[in-house]
Regions:
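Divalent metal-coordination and catalytic microenvironments
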Residues: 12, 22, 36, 51, ...
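Cap/insert and terminal regions of metallo-dependent hydrolase folds
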Residues: 23, 27, 149-174
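Active-site environment of divalent metal-dependent phosphoester hydrolases
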Residues: 28, 52-58, 76-79, 126-129, ...
Length: 174
């Protein structure tokens, strides 16, 4: 996991190359690349977006030139149009920053010797939230559906619902 100015970035690095979960801000793309490059000689092959917020997707236009971007269909829809989050307006991302693979409920990527399962959990933090399960490593990346030490921000303006976020947490504890 890489940590920085935005959300945490999950990394799978190995013989197949590199997969990252979320990519933070475009001005940080070179620093993000410098952090994962020593982990594998292979290329960046996948970027998984856990939701559409700028601190998780705004380096997509940089990394989308070399890797497949994968996200829930609502993430692509929201990144394709002007959006508002906490009073800030964000312009649509250019084509190279949009997810090219989308899903409605779940998608699996078989990469670096394990199944990486991406599951949409509707209406928690936003209406495009996904949780990423690294099945062999027994690791979960929850995007902004989990905040260490405090309750997550629920973006009701963009489809988030407190009760659904609670339901997600409850389902993962089983």
């Amino acid at each position: 996991m890489l940590e920085g100015a935005g959300g945490s970035i999950g990394v799978s690095a190995g013989a197949d190359g590199v997969l990252i979960v979320d990519d933070q801000f475009s001005p940080l793309a070179d620093k993000v690349r410098a952090a994962f490059k020593p982990l594998s000689p292979g290329p960046l092959r996948f970027v998984l977006n856990t939701h559409f917020h700028f601190d998780h997707t705004h380096a997509n236009p940089v990394f989308g030139r070399e890797a497949l971007i994968v996200a829930h269909a609502n993430v692509r829809r929201r990144l394709s149009v002007e959006t508002n989050v906490l009073g800030e307006t964000y312009k649509p991302l250019p084509k190279e920053g949009l997810p090219v693979v989308t899903y409605e409920t779940t998608v699996s990527i078989h990469f670096n010797g394990e199944e990486i399962r991406v599951v949409h959990f509707p209406s928690g933090h936003t209406d495009g939230d996904s949780v990423v399960f690294f099945t062999a490593s027994n690791v979960i990346h929850m995007g902004d559906d989990f905040f260490a030490g405090r309750f997550p921000f629920v973006d009701v303006e963009n489809g988030g619902r407190v009760l659904d976020l609670y339901g997600l947490a409850e389902s993962l504890s089983d």
